[in-house]
Structure formats: structure tokens, C-alpha cells
Amino acid sequence: MKKVGIVMGSDSDLPILRKTMDTLASLEIPYECHIYSAHRTPEEARDFALNARKNNFGCLIAAAGMAAHLAGAIAANTTQPVIGIPCKGHCFDGMDALLSTVMMPSGIPVATVAVNGGVNAALLAAQILAVADADLAARLDAKRASDAAAVLKKDAALQEELNK
């Protein structure tokens, strides 16, 4: 099975990526996670991207806040799918990171999820890998069904409360 390569610009992004890793683990998807900065450790970030295929990564997830150039720097050095997670920083409620992540030049795409969207990044990575993995696709289908059942259970409880 292909792995997901995860990289964050700073350990301050770790709480968001823990949700990513937990979601991947719940779907039995192997992953590898590193802290590499587009600005402070550009060679390591570049090498991580350049070696994505060799390291059996089916896709990459890059999370960063503020200037948030990491996902773009990763995407510039691989043709594997890259998912960007813009992280809330100290100002602008993450809008600076969102715009830095989503506004990529033509030819260097980054699929971008919501600010702090670690769970959706993991689910998108799972969907990318599931294109070539029927067992993973079945696990994703089961998760969707379980999530739907949880919502319907909450609705039933609400209806019971309102109809008393």
C-alpha cells in the first residue's frame, strides 16, 4: 500500500496534524511525518518532495501557517498529488495561510482544504489512494456509512427530546 507523506512547517502545526495522522491510522493508511520549513530547511523540504515516489508516497500533505509556502515548495518538486493545509497563525485567522496555499501558479497545483482542515486532508489523501486500492475504498465507504449513522442517531435523539 502506498503511504502518505506528511510535512509541517513548524511543531506549532502538530495539533492539527495529529488529527490528520489519527484519521489516516483509523483507515489503516501508513504515513510518515516530518517537520521541514520551506524557509528554514529548504533543502530537506525539497528532498522530501523529490524522493516521494522512491519513498512510496502516493500523495503528500503539507501544513503551514502565516506565509505558508511549504505546500507550494513541495508541489514544485514533485508530480505526486499535494494537499495543503493552511494553519491558523497569530493574525488574520489563517486567511494569510489560506491564500498562500491556494493561490498557486498554473502548472503547480496544490489541493487545498479549509484552514486547520487536518481531517479533510487525511480523507482527501485516502480518496486519492483509494482510486487504486479497492480495500481502502471499502474502508472509506464504511466510514461514510458510520458517520451518516452517527448523524441520524443524533437526529433521532433530538426528535425524541422535541416530541416529549
For every predicted segment, state its role:
Residues 77-106:
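Glycine/small-residue-rich loop that forms an oxyanion/phosphate-binding "nest" at active or ligand-binding sites
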Residues 2-40:
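Glycine-rich phosphate/diphosphate-binding loop of Rossmann-like nucleotide-binding domains
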Residues 48-86:
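Glycine-rich phosphate-binding loop
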Residues 33, 43, 66, 158-164:
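Acidic, glycine/proline-rich low-complexity segments that act as flexible tails and inter-domain linkers
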Residues 13-17, 42-45, 64-73, 92-95, ...:
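Short glycine/serine/threonine-rich phosphate/pyrophosphate-binding segments
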Residues 33-54:
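N-terminal beta-loop-helix "entrance" segment that forms/cooperates
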Residues 8-15, 19-20, 95-164:
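C-terminal binding/interaction regions
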Residues 2, 29-32, 79-81, 102-110:
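Glycine/charged-rich beta-loop-alpha catalytic/anionic-binding loops adjacent to active sites
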